[in-house]
Regions:
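Basic/aromatic DNA-contact patch characteristic of tyrosine site-specific recombinases
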Residues: 1-84
Length: 84
């Protein structure tokens, strides 16, 4: 996961968050702060319990997808295109 602060010292307004589900998987969602309002965007991406190398590789790929989505939303928020 990316660090809490950007290189210019401001806090990020879009963060990847995780929520543990009852079946043992972990759901990923974005926590978006825009104009003082917090919204959540659930990504429908899930991490598996890391029991094998294949699970670890799968989770790395899913986190990479989530990071790509996060950076796209960050750009949208910064350019004020994101509607809450």
């Amino acid at each position: 996961m990316a660090s809490e602060k950007e290189s210019n010292g401001r806090k990020e307004s879009v963060k990847i968050r995780q929520r543990k589900l009852s079946d043992g998987t972990t759901s990923l969602y974005l926590d978006i702060m825009h104009n003082g309002k917090r919204t959540r965007e659930f990504l429908k991406l899930y991490l598996n319990e890391e029991k094998s190398r294949a699970d670890k590789e799968y989770n790395r790929q899913i986190m990479a997808q989530a990071e790509m989505i996060r950076s796209q939303r960050q750009i949208e928020v910064q350019s004020k295109q994101y509607e809450v």
